[in-house]
Structure formats: C-alpha cells, structure tokens
Amino acid sequence: MANYLTAKLPGIGGSIKTCPDDFLVEELPLYPTCGEGEHLYLEVEKRGMTTFELLKRLSRALQVNERAMGYAGLKDAQATTRQFISVTDCSAEQALALQLQDIRILSARRHRNKLRLGHLAGNRFTITIRDIDSDALEKARDILHVLQMTGVPNFFGEQRYGALGNSHLIGQAIVQKNFSQAAAHIIGDPDKIIHPEWRQGAILYAENRLEEAEQALPRRMRNERNLVRSLRQGRSAEKAVRRLPGKLLRLYLSAYQSHLFDRLVSMRLESLETLWTGDIAYKHDNGACFLVTDAALEQPRADRFEISPTAPLFGHKVMMAEAQAGILEQALLAKEGITPDDFRLGAGLSMPGERRPLRIPISETASNQQGNELELSFSLPKGSFATTVLHEVMKTDV
C-alpha cells in the first residue's frame, strides 16, 4: 500500500513488533455464551504462535479431537492474542488447570453450538510503537480523528501475498488460465529468494532441469517438489498445478481477489465516504448490499456511517456496480484481460465473489505516549486489518 487517506498529515514513523507483547489482539465475541450446552468456550491467551499451533497444543493437553475444536478467526503469530476456542468432552476445571508455555486459559464457559469461522464481531488492538519523536502523540491523534470521521480504508494489504509477495500473481495466472506462469511463480523468482537451497532449485527449474530442481528444493517444500515432479512425469502445467491442495490454490485466488479490491480502494481513496449513483452500498448493521439509484438521497446515511460504497471481490456470481462505479470495475477487469466468469474454475476452485465495503469504522480509540514509545488502542470490525491503521499513523511500510 503506497496510498494514504491522511496524506496531508505527517506520520509518526517508528517500529512495531519488536516483541510479541508490543502487539495485543483481543477477539470481540459475536454473541454471549449461555452457560449451558456440550461446547466449552475457552478464552485463551497465546503468545508468539499461530492459531493452528494453539489448536494442536490444546488438543494434546486436553486429549480432545482437534477437528472437533472451533475458532472464530486466525490470529497473528507475531503477537500476544486473546481468542475463543470451543471444545467438547472437556470440563471447565480441566481446562482452567492447564499450565502450558505461552498459553493461558483466561475463562471457560459453556454454550450450545460449536464456534465457527466468522463468529466474531471484531478485534481490539493495543499496539506499542517504538522509536518515535516527542510530538508523535499529537500527530497520531490528528490522524485518528480523520479516520474516525471518514472511516479506515478497507485495504487487505500485502500480508496475503506470501513469503515472496507473489501469491496474487499466482492467482492471476490461474484465473487467466496461464498455468505455466502460475507454476513459475509458485517455484519463485531466483532473484527474490534468499534461502540458498530454494534459490538453487528455482534456478534449475528456470533452466528446465526438472529432476535436479526437485532434488535441490528443500524437503519441507512438499507442494513445490510435487509440482516439479508432476511436470517431470509429463503432466501438463494445468494438471500439475491443479494437483496441488485445493486450500492452497484457493489462497492464491483469494490473494488475487484482494489485490484487485485494493486497487479499487486506491482509485476512490479521496472520497471513500461518498456514494455514487450506481454504487452497490453496504449496510454496516447487517452486511446486506443494495444498488444506489439516487446517491444524493442515500448520502445522509453514508454520512452517519450506516452505509458505505463497496468494491467487488471479483467472482462469477458477484453483483457488479453500474454507471460510473461500474465503469471503474469493468475497466480494471479489461486491463487484467478477464471477466467475472473467468473465476468459474471448477474442481472446487470456483470463486463466487462478494462485495466488500471500501471503508470500515474505527472505534474505542486511545493513545498514550511515554518517552519514545506510543501505545495505540482501537477496535475494528471482523475481516479488517490493524496494519491499515498503522500504515496511516506511521506512514511507513508495516
């Protein structure tokens, strides 16, 4: 992300995530627990690990089936996070007695249903920004005021683009049916790879020395090695790519959707709060979308942050905007050389698409400075990212 909604306001610079305690994420539940039922909701604090690692360690310690465990969202590994995990066949006393390194069970309460992905209202963030100037607090508060009035640009950002920053390019190549290009991106550009064995494997792949490339790639890179093996055995690039795990391929496609969405946010960054006739508007209270036939009539609702303009996560079923907003969307598709129907990929890979608001509300903001450190707190709805707020406040790559 190179664009700023608050471009006229200077950032505070600084650095984040010097240690996991500098970045605290607290999950905001979608509904309260009722106190009865077969599912036990654990409020868990983890430090410096992924949600998947947390699930694995809890399942072993509690001797419960990991597949029966539920969670509402994935949380940052390079942080201290508090989130809810649902388990069955476990007592509250057993869970609360657990003593695990970097894991704390904060509470345990029963509920009737399993926790599912998306069952959260949002997240609250408390972030320490270090190495800042003496006037950082005033600058941060000025920026936060603008974000509260206008909304936060709903960028995905580059965290979805993988280790080489090219996941969206893999997704693009798949949608464009250029599977040879997709395979090349999956193996990686040697000039962008630091790991020596991976780099050597990528060089050999680029030279079409497939057997040597397969041997050179690190053994932990199973998907890449399997891809090269499929090609070496004579399969087409399309068949070789499609043999990769569907979950991985959908991540690539999702990254491409996110990339295109971010480009549309950038195009409308200077007027995120302004509705256009032909927009598809998003209702913040229930997530419903509708066509704006009279922008002037609906604008007061946008001013109250009841509704916002949207852009598509492109897919074969997505509702497209009309008039000026529709022209922007169609122009981007034309530039990419694709249509919404190109996301109809079959074999479990088809992406139906959806609308996503261009902006999201930020609430419960607080800031405090002690010397060259600033503590920043705020809450965001689910599906949005703290990095966007930090991007605006710091004016640096986050």
Swiss-Prot record:
GO terms for biological process: tRNA pseudouridine synthesis. Keywords: Isomerase, tRNA processing. Residues 151-360 form the TRUD domain. It holds the Pfam family TruD. The keyword tRNA processing applies. One of its GO terms (cellular component) is cytosol. NCBIfam families: tRNA_TruD_broad. This is tRNA pseudouridine synthase D. It comes from Syntrophotalea carbinolica (strain DSM 2380 / NBRC 103641 / GraBd1). The gene is truD.
